Amino acid sequence: GPWESSLTPYMIDPINTLSAREYDAVVFVGPARTGKTEGLIDGWIVYGIICDPADMLVVQMTETKAREHSRTRLSRTFRHSPEVSKRLSPSRNDNNVHDKMFLDGSFLKIGWPSITVFSSSDYRRVALTDYDRFPENVDGEGDAFTLASKRTTTFMSSGMTLVESSPGRDITDTKWRCGGAH
């Protein structure tokens, strides 16, 4: 059904920060099944399609999970939202499980952590979901966050990288400290 922010009021700040130009990334770590993917990932996709069209890359933990997310959550959302479905390109060649084109020319890529997904394309928005399940080094090229963030640099202050995760890994940098609320 429709998003109801009163059920997850703790998601409002991170969601709003996604459009704040003074930040180039949002990293949200929280328990499983608390609205992170629906609010941050799916909500950001829909917001972008309807309110602020731009190319976007969504990276799931594996190719199988990318396909599943596209075929279940995104396909259902697109089908049941008149505002989204009327913007989707009607051409069969424009839409498949990993690529979605829209009438305004914007593009949504649903991928997985591989150097080919993280190379040679620019996206204003990049979202990494279930980051704790990503490999620590993607195809010998570095961590997924650094690779993903490079995709948004062309867009300067309007580029944004989102990482959503559960606390599934030990902290490796014990000197890191949060510098502020965001």
Where are these regions (language model features)?
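Phosphate/NTP-binding elements of NTP-utilizing enzymes
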Residues: 1-182
